[in-house]
């Protein structure tokens, strides 16, 4: 299915393009490739649409972090995440953005004003990019689909902690709730 966009009603949502997340060992795409592809997408979408960056952040002592019992919990650094680690990747920031959404869980929709901001801007289609493919990106894609947005995932502008995690999400989950495409195809459809 070929892509067609109404660029005035399209937003790029970049999940957690922060130094600490992009500093992790990512696969299948290294952080520099993810950041470069995000910048290409932002350059194509921003002239008529909207670019939104999300950031994961927590209050002192992680009082607002989830603490439910699980078998494999996310380990957060004792004493908090340093400010430099929370900062956005400079390649992504240089591409420009319109809004920042702070989130405290995987999905950019849950507990944030993302849906409100998208609807007030007349957004009907979202393009997703960022890290981690099978956590923040997938959770946001699921919620976007449930909120009746058309979802496009830029596969090569996403990555995860392992190729197997990324590929399962992109090949098994995302096609049921989104269109999964390469950055170049999305950029071409926006021109």
Please annotate each region the language model reported:
Residues 137-147:
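Short Gly/Thr/Asp-enriched flexible loops that form oxyanion-binding sites at enzyme active sites
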Residues 1-99, 189-191:
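Active-site acidic carboxylates
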Residues 127-130, 148-163:
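A short glycine-rich beta-strand->turn/loop micro-motif centered on a GG-aromatic cluster
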Residues 162-175:
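Active-site-proximal loop->helix
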Residues 82-131:
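Internal catalytic-core helix/loop-beta-alpha segment
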Residues 47-49, 122, 148:
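Glycine-centered short loops/turns at secondary-structure junctions
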Residues 177-191:
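A charged, well-structured terminal subsegment
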